[in-house]
């Protein structure tokens, strides 16, 4: 099975995309070629002797060279040449014709697979003296590394002898041909390279594949004595029967299968010398090969040629490398043009300077700077200029803008025009292909590190033997002796070889004699915010410059560099685990620098994901995780996953058909077609999400509504190019941790989640994995059909697991649909397997009803917990997943602690609530309402919510940690605030209330304690339903629900029937809060609406300016009286308060709710003159007046709790989880209303227990409380991705 898996993996590696999308493994040493083999062999036999296409020789020699060679060798006439060219043209057409994909019989002479692909017959070209061979000569590198830089790159590609470059290198065809070759300069060679025909484009595209097979030099064996190679000199001129399956026309399998070093173009006789022939014979002995290396790659010929160039972007690695190398070749050509223009520009500069030397002597310094810059740019290598050009252009443009209009500014503009020829091309590369370049490198590195001692075929290396590592030159080195990257040496060492063995091999290697001191590739510049680039002229122009063989060589060498840059997957995971205790200033666990490590831990599945796939993986992981949140049985979840996979595959197929029918580049699909998919896709999955009365809890709002998609689209400055369409921050606002959240409301009704997630702009990377998706769905269905108790079920599940692993190993992309869903299916099958084993041991176990009891204390909860959270204990979030660091604040019956997720290192604020208190104080509905609101609201001025879960005694709400404290703590430290600062804070509260009211939510407990300050200094509302106001502690005395907390607009409130005795009790309990901020209608219980929040805004505005609330008094009864009688101690106007502030506060504190400011909506509040200087559209993006400056990520010094801590807080945690309160003294600041909080707290606890024991129902269930907010967890992925490129991680100390 291991051997079989290697074949599957090798198939996955292959960048081929044969027409039938076959990914099935091929047996070792198989002699039967596939379709494209048949196609090529037949086309070769039908088209007579394959005369090479003249454009194909553009890589290393001119078209006239071939014609001259043919004339001098055979004396053929022009007519014959014309006929040959017509034949060659027909060969090129047949290669591009989709109709030739079938009906081609295999050649009978292929015996050894791709390693023994025979060369094209020299006699068929009329060049009988050319020596050809099928294996590379690693020893030649000793002689050829010192070649002149102008040496042909075609030979360095390792073409078997059928390449005209090789033929010319070994040809002794007369002085005329050699003169032409010797006379070709570096520039001439490069120009010729750029003149290749479109027909060459296809050949080069095939040769660019990084995964097209093991290097031919792995076993540079010659065929047996009966092979054609040894009889090449006497072979017939036609060569019809001798064309191998991999040789049709100019397309030769060896072109990309043999990365061979260069021949001597300038000295063709060397290849015919006795020493050369001796070396050839010495290196021709057969060598043992690895079984996994025997694989036919002939099917990859013409696999892309049937498509026109604009359809190149199915994002398979070989296609990507083709385009990347094309861009690099164009960049080099553009650089040469820039050099030429800069020379002319410098001459003009000197002329202008001479004319104006006397009249404008002050220009001399500027002219000199321009001359120096022009010379520096001209002397810079293309590789260095690739990195530097953007910065140069930016600096030059900055200097230009500082100049007054005139000659100097015109000269700067002219130079900018010259240089931007390169920067425009670079920008196109970054916008369109920057991410794919990293995908190719990352995928290759992962593949290479997963197979031991299998040399990577796409890395551009040549393993003649284990002891002969070699260094390849990039295209620029071969042409111009240029270097692409600083201080990087690529050595051909097997990825898993130990360093000491490698050192020995390296010292023994003769190729080490000529090792380059630095191996420099075309680097990938730092990526910026990108938009979905439209198809550019380079893509749509049918005359686009084709990629050349030399460029493909350089692209494969790029992949080799990636091996050194990326650690194996295991090592990467271990490396990341070392940093899990570190925290960045975004307060998400520190990740290694993304540009170096190229992976982060997904916050949904907590698996390592390549950064280039984070976007797609987050969407896939959201879908895969959805049904684990519902407490469904194992079989139900397996069927749900299978249905999701079927829908994904169907969506992809539908998009592909639309793209083929209507899109010129196969990628652009209109939104109208995407929305039409909802009529095609099955609705059963969305039906599952709406069972029973838990629509609000289990409807998966983060995937079911467009807000989740808006979040994915709205994240700015993404370092990886996204496929959600153009990036824009219009309508978006910045919140903490540099996240972006929309202002859009929660849409109803909710569409199908899969249609929303997959129906967005763009597509996943892994559309080519559709067959594997279907296979995964079939496996999941089969596993779900396994009958518990059947003797054959357990072996059947084991076979399902084996098949599942095979399918996963055949995936083409890591961390996307196949791997993510495959992992979930594997987990579910294993879970079912364990249950079946338990059934065999204990017949009393019921598989369909066995779940983990989350609440445990009551027997009824066992039944209710069927719908709780995932069955598997690893998937159920609990307090054990968090490390409690320190307390933050205390509320009426809840505590807030700073905690760290153990697996990721992310910091969170966990609100801990006692179930007994919730029940005793009649606040169960309130806490459930708070959780539901936090799940659904998404606004930059509302705190973000991530998890909710329970244990035996407590409820837990996990929210983002905001280190800036709250406005109450700020007031305690500063006394009062400047009116300008207050204006901004209140404006942000207005925006938050506008959003909440539009969603039908009334906060009802606004006060400075509930206005938190985020990392960026902006305000965030919290505490939806769990108020710290003292009245809520007396709800056990009320006939109705709590008078304080969050409600919906249409919720009717009970009247407040408070007696004098109850008011006295409130006095005693004043330690837990006061009713300062409550509106009169709430105090009176006469019914209230959204205007109650505007009353609270007026109170807060007054307190921020003055320092104390307007109705403050020693006892709650006096506060109550002040509120009802509107006794406000107004400060002096305008000395202590502006007239505008006085007016808006007065209108906010209007007793009649219908006359109160805000009764007609937030619009009239925003139009008040007090906010005349506020820009509401950009408020969230403006810099705050106060930005927290914490000493560390776990610094909680900004929080000053209104309430004291006591020993009863230890009851909030299971044994062993009691936090250390040694540093809680800084938070135990009490309000002025209390005398002895500790005693009163103890009295309250005692009283509470007494009340709990007398009449409170004890069977209340919190089984529906658990929730995992997938969309917010996905937003952490984007926070990490966007911040990882620009923020240095900060390390936090461990809390002892």
Swiss-Prot record:
SUPFAM superfamilies: Protein kinase-like (PK-like) (SSF56112). Keywords: ATP-binding, Growth regulation, Kinase, Metal-binding, Nucleotide-binding, Phosphoprotein, Serine/threonine-protein kinase, Transferase, Zinc, Zinc-finger. PROSITE patterns: AGC_KINASE_CTER (PS51285), PROTEIN_KINASE_DOM (PS50011), PROTEIN_KINASE_ST (PS00108). SMART domains: S_TKc (SM00220). ATP binds at residues 888-896, 911. Gene3D superfamilies: Phosphorylase Kinase, domain 1 (3.30.200.20), Transferase(Phosphotransferase) domain 1 (1.10.510.10). It holds the Pfam family Pkinase. The modification Phosphoserine is found at residues 32, 1070. InterPro entries: AGC-kinase_C, Kinase-like_dom_sf, Prot_kinase_dom, Ser/Thr_kinase_AS, Ser_Thr_kinase_AGC. Residues 1172-1277 form the AGC-kinase C-terminal domain. The active site is at 1005 (proton acceptor). Signal peptide: none annotated. It catalyses: L-seryl-[protein] + ATP = O-phospho-L-seryl-[protein] + ADP + H(+); L-threonyl-[protein] + ATP = O-phospho-L-threonyl-[protein] + ADP + H(+). Residues 10-32, 214-249 have a biased composition (Low complexity). Residues 1-274, 457-480, 524-553, 724-750, 1214-1245 are annotated as: Disordered. Its EC number is 2.7.11.1. The keyword Lipoprotein does not apply. GO terms for molecular function: ATP binding; kinase activity; protein serine kinase activity; protein serine/threonine kinase activity; zinc ion binding. Belongs to the protein kinase superfamily. AGC Ser/Thr protein kinase family. PANTHER family: SERINE/THREONINE-PROTEIN KINASE (PTHR24356), SERINE_THREONINE-PROTEIN KINASE GREATWALL (PTHR24356:SF1). May be involved in root hair elongation. This is Probable serine/threonine protein kinase IREH1. The lineage of its organism: Eukaryota, Viridiplantae, Streptophyta, Embryophyta, Tracheophyta.
């Amino acid at each position: 099975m291991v051997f079989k898996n290697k074949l599957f993996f090798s198939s996955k590696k292959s960048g081929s995309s044969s027409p039938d999308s076959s990914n099935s493994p091929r047996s070792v040493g198989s002699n039967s070629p596939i379709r494209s083999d048949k196609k090529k062999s037949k086309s070769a036999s039908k088209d007579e002797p394959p005369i090479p296409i003249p454009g194909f020789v553009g890589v290393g020699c001119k078209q006239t060279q071939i014609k001259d060679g043919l004339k001098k060798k055979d004396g053929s006439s022009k007519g014959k040449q014309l006929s040959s060219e017509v034949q060659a043209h027909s060969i090129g057409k047949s290669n591009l014709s989709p109709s030739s994909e079938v009906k081609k019989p295999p050649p009978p002479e292929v015996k050894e697979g791709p390693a023994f692909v025979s060369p094209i017959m020299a006699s068929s070209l009329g060049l009988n003296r050319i020596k050809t061979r099928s294996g590379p000569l690693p020893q030649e590198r000793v002689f050829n590394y010192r070649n002149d830089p102008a040496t042909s790159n075609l030979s360095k590609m390792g073409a078997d002898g059928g390449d005209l470059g090789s033929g010319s290198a070994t040809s002794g065809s007369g002085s005329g041909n050699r003169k032409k070759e010797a006379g070709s300069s570096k520039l001439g060679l490069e120009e010729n390279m750029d003149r290749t025909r479109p027909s060459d484009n296809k050949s080069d595209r095939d040769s660019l594949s990084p995964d097209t097979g093991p290097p031919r030099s792995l076993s540079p064996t010659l065929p047996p004595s009966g092979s054609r190679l040894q009889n090449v000199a006497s072979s017939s001129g036609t060569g019809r029967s001798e064309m191998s399956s991999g040789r049709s026309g100019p397309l030769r399998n060896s072109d990309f299968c043999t990365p061979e070093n260069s021949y001597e173009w300038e000295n063709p006789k060397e290849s015919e010398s006795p020493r050369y022939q001796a070396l050839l014979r010495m290196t021709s002995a057969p060598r043992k090969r690895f079984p996994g290396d025997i694989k036919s790659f002939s099917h990859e010929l013409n696999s892309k040629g049937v498509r026109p160039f604009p359809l190149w972007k199915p994002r398979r690695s070989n296609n990507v490398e083709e385009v990347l190398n094309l861009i690099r070749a164009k960049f080099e050509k553009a650089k040469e043009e820039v050099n030429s223009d800069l020379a002319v520009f410098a001459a003009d500069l000197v002329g202008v300077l001479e004319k104006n030397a006397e009249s404008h002597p002050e220009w001399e310094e500027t002219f000199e700077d321009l001359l120096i810059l022009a010379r520096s740019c001209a002397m810079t290598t293309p590789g260095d200029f690739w990195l530097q050009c953007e910065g140069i252009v930016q600096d030059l443009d900055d200097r230009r803008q500082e100049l007054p209009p005139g000659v100097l500014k015109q000269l700067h503009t002219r130079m900018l025009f010259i240089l931007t020829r390169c920067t425009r091309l670079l920008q196109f590369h970054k916008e369109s292909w920057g991410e794919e370049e990293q995908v190719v490198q990352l995928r290759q590195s992962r593949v290479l590190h997963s197979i031991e001692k299998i040399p990577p075929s796409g890395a551009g290396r040549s393993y003649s033997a284990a002891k002969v590592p070699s260094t390849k030159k990039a295209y620029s080195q071969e042409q111009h002796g240029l270097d692409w990257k600083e201080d990087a040496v690529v050595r051909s060492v097997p990825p898993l070889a130990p360093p000491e063995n490698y050192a020995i091999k390296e010292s023994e290697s003769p190729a080490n004699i000529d090792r380059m001191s630095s191996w420099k590739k075309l680097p990938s510049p730092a990526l910026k915010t990108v938009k979905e680039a439209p198809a550019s002229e380079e893509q749509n122009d049918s005359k686009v410059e084709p990629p050349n063989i030399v460029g493909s060589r350089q692209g494969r060498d790029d992949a080799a560099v990636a091996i050194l840059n990326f650690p194996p997957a295991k090592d990467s995971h271990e490396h990341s685990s070392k940093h899990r205790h570190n925290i960045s200033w975004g307060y998400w666990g520190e990740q290694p620098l993304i540009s170096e490590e190229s992976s982060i831990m997904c916050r949904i599945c907590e698996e390592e994901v390549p950064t280039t796939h984070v976007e797609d993986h987050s969407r896939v992981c959201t879908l895969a995780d959805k049904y684990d949140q519902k407490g469904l049985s194992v079989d139900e979840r397996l069927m749900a996953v299978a249905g999701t996979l079927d829908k994904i595959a169907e969506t992809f197929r539908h998009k592909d058909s639309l793209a083929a029918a209507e899109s010129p580049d196969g990628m652009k699909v209109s939104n109208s077609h995407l929305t039409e998919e909802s009529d095609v896709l099955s609705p059963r999955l969305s039906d599952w999400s709406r069972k029973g009365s838990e629509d609000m809890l289990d409807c998966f709002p983060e995937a079911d509504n467009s807000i989740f998609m808006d979040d994915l689209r709205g994240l700015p400055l993404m370092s990886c190019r996204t496929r959600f369409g153009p990036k824009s921050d219009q309508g978006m606002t910045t919140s903490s941790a540099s996240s972006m959240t929309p202002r859009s409301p929660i849409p109803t009704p909710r569409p199908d989640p899969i249609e929303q997630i997959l129906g967005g702009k763009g597509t996943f990377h892994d559309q080519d994995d559709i067959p594997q998706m279907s296979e995964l769905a079939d496996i999941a269905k089969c596993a779900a059909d396994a009958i518990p108790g059947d003797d054959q079920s357990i072996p059947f599940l084991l076979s399902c697991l084996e098949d599942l692993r095979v399918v996963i190993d055949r995936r083409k992309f890591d961390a996307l649909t196949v791997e993510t869903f495959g992992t979930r299916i594997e987990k579910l099958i294993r879970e079912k397997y364990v249950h079946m084993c338990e059934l065999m041991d204990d017949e009393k176990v019921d598989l369909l009803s066995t779940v983990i009891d989350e609440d445990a204390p009551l027997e009824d909860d066992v039944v209710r917990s069927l719908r709780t959270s995932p069955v598997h204990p690893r998937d159920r979030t609990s307090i054990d997943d968090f490390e409690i660091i320190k307390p933050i604040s205390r509320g009426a019956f809840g505590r807030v602690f700073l905690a760290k997720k153990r697996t990721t290192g992310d910091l969170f604020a966990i609100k801990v609530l006692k179930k007994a208190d919730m029940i005793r104080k009649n606040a169960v509905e309130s806490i459930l309402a708070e959780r539901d609101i936090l799940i659904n609201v998404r606004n930059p001025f509302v705190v973000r919510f991530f998890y909710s879960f329970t244990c035996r005694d407590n409820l837990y709400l996990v929210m983002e940690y905001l280190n800036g404290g709250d406005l109450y703590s700020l007031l305690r430290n500063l006394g009062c605030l400047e009116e300008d600062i207050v204006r901004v804070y209140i404006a942000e509260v207005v925006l938050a209330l506008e959003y909440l009211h539009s969603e039908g939510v009334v906060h009802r407990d606004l006060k400075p304690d509930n206005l938190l300050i985020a990392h960026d200094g902006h305000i965030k509302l919290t505490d939806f339903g769990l108020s710290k106001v003292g009245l809520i502690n007396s709800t056990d005395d009320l006939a109705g629900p709590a008078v304080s907390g969050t409600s919906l607009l249409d919720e009717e409130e009970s009247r407040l029937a408070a007696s004098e005795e109850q008011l006295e009790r409130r006095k005693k309990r004043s330690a837990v809060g006061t009713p300062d901020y409550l509106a009169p209608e709430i105090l009176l219980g006469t019914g209230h609406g959204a205007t109650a929040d505007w009353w609270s805004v007026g109170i807060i505005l007054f307190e921020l300016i003055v320092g104390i609330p307007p109705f403050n008094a020693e006892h709650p009864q006096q506060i109550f009286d002040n509120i009802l009688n509107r006794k406000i101690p107004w400060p002096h106007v305008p000395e202590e308060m502006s007239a505008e502030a006085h007016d808006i506060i007065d209108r906010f504190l209007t007793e009649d709710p219908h006359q109160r400011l805000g009764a007609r909506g937030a619009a009239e509040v925003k139009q008040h003159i007090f906010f005349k200087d506020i820009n509401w559209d950009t408020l969230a993006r403006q810099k705050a007046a106060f930005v927290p400056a914490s000493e560390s990520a776990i610094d909680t010094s900004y929080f000053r709790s209104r309430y004291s801590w006591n020993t009863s807080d230890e009851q909030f945690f299971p044994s062993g989880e009691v936090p250390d309160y040694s540093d809680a003294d800084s938070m135990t600041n009490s309000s002025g209303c209390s005398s002895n909080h500790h005693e009163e707290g103890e009295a309250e606890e005692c009283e509470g227990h007494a009340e709990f024991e007398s009449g409170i129902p004890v069977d209340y269930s919190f089984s529906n409380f658990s929730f995992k907010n997938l969309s917010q967890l996905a937003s952490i992925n984007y926070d990490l991705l966007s911040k990882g490129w620009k923020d240095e991680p900060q390390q936090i100390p461990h809390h002892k």
